[in-house]
Amino acid sequence: MPSPSPSSSARGDAPLPERPEALTSYQRWLFFFLSVATFFEGYDLFALAQILPNLRADMGLDPVYAGMLVSFASVGNVLAYFVVDRADRWGRKRVLTITIVGYTIFSLLTAFSTNVWTFALCQLVARIFLLGEYAVAMVYAAEEYPAARRGMVIGVIQACASLGAIVCAIVVPFLLQTPWGWRSVYLVGTVPLVIIAIARRNLRETERFSREAGDEASRDRSFGRILRTPYRARVFQLAAIWALTLFCTQNAVTFWKEFAI
């Protein structure tokens, strides 16, 4: 009888990979909640690019001033850091709720803008909350799910933001035909308020934040703390990748409908 080859023995002795831990009912609910909230984040963030030609015509803007408007609103993407920073002090639950309610309210106010100045201001503040929601949703996903499931959860939530942008591009041509025109695109953004009213009671603080809330060693939550950790190089590498990616793609995405269609 032939003896087993070393390779077959090695394969036989190798432990089978463990199945990922099943998600709890709360984790499944949280997965759905974060996905829906981030879907509307993607929808609202992409709305300006979709309505820009109509907005220019309605408010009498030339392409140069339209570009300045987009740049001004995009400053909110940077200012979102100061909202996300509060999550380390006030808690993830409180800040996530604030960001969702914030971007909903300012998207609604955008629909009632009377001139380009009020539109620009509403969009700047809305983007602070939009990017804040996205960042805190990622924190929730990182802290509330086991390592074996974390990549899948984060990937699906991020995909929902892209799906929101795709849906925005699909429905905008129809919404522009309504009596409200481009304003109706932002009126749709009030839907998250209904979600918050129904679902907020089930949202919990993350276990990690609750555990570390009274820990003296974890109270240094300043930005400078990153410079004193082993991960500082990785943080700046990822920041550079994101900055270069957006630098290359943002203009193309924002002005695609203006010049390519």
Positions of predicted regions on the chain:
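Helix-loop junctions at membrane interfaces in 12-TM secondary transporters
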Residues: 111-122, 178-180
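Extracytoplasmic
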Residues: 29-63, 249-257
